[in-house]
């Protein structure tokens, strides 16, 4: 029969394994692990570039000051800087995004499957919110002004909307993953390739199939660049 000390040791080992399993991104085991995007090695993230080939440019991205176009249907542009743009972010568990909103523009309901987001308003006003998981689906929302900060928990559906019909808005978001991912809800549901059966969606949304067919025929705008 196993001794109490053996059970304690097993519990500690299981806790350590569980902690590693739920960690958002792999933690660094050295000063840095610049992503080698050309390596044939397949890992969760990227293999490390040989440190002797690393230079300051691997940790650098030119200024995000130019105002992107906001002429798409939703009236916003998300300029994401993640490990694909700054390879030095590999294993560091962070990325950043600038979001530009036209008057009455929005960053439509979406989720980041691998990251929590913290958003700061740089210019203008934003109405923001997130919805909790089933069964309550509670909406937490707030009107933010310049300098205000709001947090969107990992994996939850959230949005931002510029309520001003005359002035644009700008926000900066930090995300707790080198590659947070983004799933825009309408795009995923109505713009999937191949499309989800209209029988399934009609029952899910409790509408006529003709309504689903019309929605699936629309062009679902991608505002992430």
UniProtKB/Swiss-Prot annotation:
It comes from the Eukaryota. Residues 1-23 form the signal peptide. The keyword Nucleotide-binding does not apply. Mn(2+) binds at residues 110, 112, 117, 158. Pfam families: Cupin_1. One of its GO terms (cellular component) is apoplast. Residues 63-213 form the Cupin type-1 domain. SMART domains: Cupin_1. Its main location: secreted. It is found in: Secreted, Extracellular space, Apoplast. Disulfide bonds join 33-48. Keywords: Apoplast, Disulfide bond, Glycoprotein, Manganese, Metal-binding, Secreted, Signal. Glycans are attached at residues 77, 136. GO terms for molecular function: manganese ion binding. Belongs to the germin family. Plays a role in broad-spectrum disease resistance. Probably has no oxalate oxidase activity even if the active site is conserved. Oligomer (believed to be a pentamer but probably hexamer). This is Germin-like protein 8-7.
């Amino acid at each position: 029969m196993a001794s109490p000390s053996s059970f304690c040791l097993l519990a500690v080992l299981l806790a350590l394994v569980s902690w590693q399993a739920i960690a958002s991104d792999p933690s660094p085991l050295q000063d840095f692990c610049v992503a080698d995007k050309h390596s044939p090695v397949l890992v969760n993230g990227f293999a490390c570039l040989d440190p002797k080939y690393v230079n300051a440019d691997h940790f650098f991205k030119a200024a995000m000051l130019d105002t992107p176009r906001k002429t798409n249907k939703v009236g916003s542009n998300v300029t994401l800087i993640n490990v694909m743009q700054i390879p030095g972010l590999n294993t560091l568990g962070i990325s950043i995004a600038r979001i530009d909103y036209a008057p009455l523009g929005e960053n439509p309901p979406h989720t980041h499957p691998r990251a929590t987001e913290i958003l700061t308003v740089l210019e203008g006003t934003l109405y923001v919110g997130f919805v909790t998981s089933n069964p309550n689906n509670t909406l937490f929302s707030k009107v933010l002004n310049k300098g205000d900060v709001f947090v969107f928990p990992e994996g939850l559906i959230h949005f931002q909307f510029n309520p001003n019909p005359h002035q644009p808005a700008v926000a900066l978001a930090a995300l707790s993953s080198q590659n947070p991912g983004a799933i825009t809800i309408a795009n995923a549901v109505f713009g999937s390739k191949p499309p989800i059966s209209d029988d399934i969606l009609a029952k899910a949304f409790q509408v006529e199939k003709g309504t689903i067919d019309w929605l699936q025929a629309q062009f679902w705008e991608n505002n992430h660049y």
